[in-house]
Amino acid sequence: MELDRPFLQLPFLFDTEVLTAEVDRLVPENWLAHPSGLSGNTAVPLVSINGEPRDGFDGPMAATAVLRRSPYLLQVVSSFGEVVARSRLMRLAPGAEVQEHVDFNYHWYSRVRIHVPIVTEPTVRFFCGAEEVHMAAGEAWLFDSWRRHRVVNGSAKDRIHLVVDIAGSARFWGMVRRVQRADTVEAPQRLAFDESRESELLVERFPAAPVMAPGEMAAIVSELMSDCSANPNNNAKELEYYHDLLFDLVHDWRNHWSLYGFMEDGVSGYQALLKRTQAGLRPDPRVLVTQSNSVGINPIINQRLLAAALKSRRSKEFVTGSS
C-alpha cells in the first residue's frame, strides 16, 4: 500500500528481552526457507493459512503453534487491535541483503506491514525510495511497499524482525494520520509482558473475494493506467492499447458479475475474460512503465489483477462461512 512518505514510526515500544527469549526457544525446523529461494532469508510463520507452517495469502488465517506457545509475541501481534493477515518472524543472515524490489501483488494493494525489530544492529539499514533508516529494537515501523525498497544486514549476526500485515481499521489509519501531522514525535505506548493478559487475536478469514468485485477491479485498473500515463517516456499508442484492453475487461467483468455473481455457472465466463486479457498483453513486460516506481505494467497486471480476480474454490466458504 502507498503511504505519503517512505517510513513512518508508530508510537509503540515493546520489550525486546522477552521477545528475544521467545525467539531463542525456537528450533531450526521452525525456520522456513524463503519461497523464492532468497539466500540468507528465512522465516517462521506466526499467522498463516489454517495455522499451518507454510507461506501463502489465499485462505483463512489462524495462529500457528509457534505463536500460540509464545505468549508475548501473541500479545504484541494482538496489541495493535487490528485484523491480522499473514505474519511472521523474518530472519536475515549476517551480510545478507534483500535486493531492491516493489511489492505489487494483490495482497499489498490494501495492506501494510508493521515491522517490530527484535534482534538488530545499527548497521542493519532499510532503504525505501530516497530515504534510509535503522529500525531500532522494540520499535514499530511502517514503510511504503509501493516504492522501491531493500534491506542490508551489515552486522555480524542475524537480524530478526516481527512483521505483521494488516489492512487497518479507521482507528488505525486515524492514528497514522495523527502521527504524520504531528510537529513532535509522539511518546510511545509501552507494552510490557503481562502473564495474566488474555490476548484476543483477530485474523483474516476472507483475505479476498472468490470473484473480484467490479468496483475494485475498476479502481486497480484506473490507478495503474493513471500511473503509466504520468510517465512521459511511455508510448501514447501503447497507453491507448492497454487502456482499451483493461477497461474492456472491467466492463465485461461487470456485465458477467451482474448475471452470475459468485455462482458456479459463471466461472467459465470469468476464466474466458481473464484468458482474453492475458492473451492481449504485449510480449515486452515493460512496454509501459509506471511513473511512481518504474515497474513494468505486465507483472502488475498479472499479479494484482489476473491472478487475484478469480478464486472460485472459496465461493461456498465465502457465502456460508464454512468450507
Regions found by a protein language model. Give the residues of each.
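Extended amphipathic alpha-helical scaffold segments
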Residues: 215-268, 272-275, 279
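Non-heme Fe(II)/2-oxoglutarate
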Residues: 1-79, 186-197, 246, 263-322
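Charged, amphipathic alpha-helical linkers/stalks
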Residues: 163-235
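A short beta-strand-loop-beta hairpin characteristic of the jelly-roll/cupin
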Residues: 117-137
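A short hydrophobic beta-strand segment most commonly corresponding to one strand
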Residues: 111-117, 140, 156-174
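Conserved short histidine dyad/triad with adjacent acidic residue
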Residues: 89-107
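Short connector loops at helix/strand junctions that flank enzyme active sites
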Residues: 82-84, 93, 109-113, 121
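Short beta-strand His + acidic residue motifs that chelate non-heme Fe in jelly-roll/DSBH
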Residues: 100-101, 124-126, 143-144, 148-155
